[in-house]
Design a protein with these regions (language model features):
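Metal-dependent phosphodiesterase/phospholipase catalytic core, i.e.
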Residues: 1-118, 122-137, 146-182
Length: 183
């Protein structure tokens, strides 16, 4: 929290905060008592770290003369409702920052929510895109809902592609596919 304590409950939606309010949060370590924290017990704590803007990340890399490739994952979901901006606004802002920094040729934009990937490819075909999928008991972006489609796949109908996930990825226009599965 801005006062230096772990959030005891879900915090405010990020989109409701000003940049100054967002930067008040110390994000330099994960709470080790949470399930997420227990997944990463070796995480190096960096107390006092603030959330950088995308432009600040690009500037940080540029200041070091680096030619790092950027693998940017959009953290937006089809189940977020109005707690996040709409996918088109999200992608337009991200693409504008990528282009302003002159790093489109070394950026991959990836997401489990293919809406952002499809929009990115339409708006900025020069940016490499990656469709992500997950098939886990507690997180499945492949399993269809009652409509026969997964809300994660930008409205794509698997039946129109032989119920083949690789064909669905290709039809979405993704340059890459990263599949995650397990138990």
């Amino acid at each position: 929290s801005p006062s230096g304590f772990w959030l005891g409950a879900r915090g405010p939606a990020i989109r409701t905060l000003t940049l100054a309010e967002l930067k008040a949060y110390d994000v330099g370590r994960v709470n080790p008592s949470t399930s997420y924290g227990k997944q990463w017990p070796m995480q190096l704590a960096r107390d006092g770290e603030r959330i950088p803007t995308l432009a600040e990340v690009f500037g940080f890399v540029r200041a070091r003369g680096s030619s790092v490739r950027f693998n940017l994952e959009t953290k937006i979901t089809p189940t977020s409702g109005d707690s996040v901006v709409d996918p088109e606004t999200f992608v337009k802002v991200a693409v504008a920052e990528i282009r302003a920094a002159g790093v489109a040729d070394r950026t991959t934009l990836q997401s489990f929510d293919w809406r952002t990937v499809v929009l990115s490819k339409r708006i900025a075909p020069e940016i490499v895109t990656a469709c992500l999928t997950a098939e886990f008991p507690n997180f499945d972006t492949v399993k269809p809902d009652g409509s026969g489609r997964s809300p994660w796949q930008a409205g794509r109908d698997p039946a129109r592609h032989g119920n083949s996930l690789p064909r669905l990825v290709k039809a979405a226009g993704c340059d890459q596919w990263s599949a995650n599965a397990g138990s």
